[in-house]
Amino acid sequence: MKEDLSVVLVSNRGPVSFVQSDGNFQTQRGAGGLSGALDWAARQLGEHSIWIASAISSDDKEAMETGATEDLPEELGYRVRLLDIDAGVYDQYYDAVSNRMLWFANHCLWDELHIESFGQRELDAWNNGYEPVNKRFAKVASECFEQDALVLFQDYHLATAPGHLRKAHPGQAILH
């Protein structure tokens, strides 16, 4: 069911991560500057925002399974939707493509690698990891907004997700 949202934030890493202790889940603020900046914006928007991110750790995934993520709107002031991505697919998406290829390209260090072309391994990682994950993020984002919402995709991890969303929703306001 679509909800009345103003902003859909989409990133690989979310605003919090879960840590299990004595059978209970505690949240820790997400690492890096992205979390602090977007968390502030999401809190200002409150119920008019949702943050979609990967469930990265096993504790994140278990928190999803046990329903611990349902307490996040009360704790944070906005909704969070975590995606459970298969570990092998995530490795291709995050490590093989995002970190080993796109990080260098986006930081103008491509020439330092002295790579003139990619092999089958990189192509497989793109086709079986990076693209499917980006498509999934775009699909989930499309389930979380009304037409007047702004969808913000963050960082090179999700470089192709806006295009997938644009195909399905040509008039949607999208930032990347």
Where are these predicted regions, by residue range?
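Catalytic cores of carbohydrate-active enzymes across secretory and cytosolic contexts
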Residues: 1-176
